[in-house]
Amino acid sequence: LANVVGAVHAAVSAEVQDRGGAVGAFVGDGVLGVFGLPTAHDDDPERALGAARAILHRVEQINSTLGVRFGVSIAARIGINTGEAIIGNNGGDIFFDYTGLGDTVNTAARLEGINKYLDTRICISGSTHDQCPSILTREVGDVILKGKKDLVQTLEPLAENHRGAEW
């Protein structure tokens, strides 16, 4: 299992970094990808969606090779939220932990978690959808996420409008 998780971590890291993002943390088999760090781009939400699509493809490849070899399968689930976050060293003087904190990051993590209940692989928030006009989506609904008082608009990306490419 460690070999497969390691391969997934490497693939996710590469896809995030190839699109101008950074890896903020590895937590178990999960990865926090942050866009707008170290350099912000006007299209960071679209870059995150592109990375998500590529990550799903890479995980399928890993499952068909290493997964078969070791008898395991990784189910990739991705949550994307757009907004401001606190970025910096959250580890103190002894342990360096350069990552993102705050409601934006927490909401993305909660969106990742609800995929298994919604039978989706990528969930995005309304704030991400608003920044990605070229992406066709399916409205999943307004949901109450753990730790949130207000409903969060949740959507599933389906395709890019201008190309009709399938997700």
Region roles according to the model:
Residues 1-53, 98:
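Catalytic NTP-binding/metal-coordinating core of nucleotidyl cyclase/transferase enzymes
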Residues 13-16, 54, 107-117:
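Substrate-engagement module of ASCE P-loop NTPases
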Residues 33-34, 72-88:
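A short glycine-enriched loop-to-beta-strand structural element that forms part of the catalytic core
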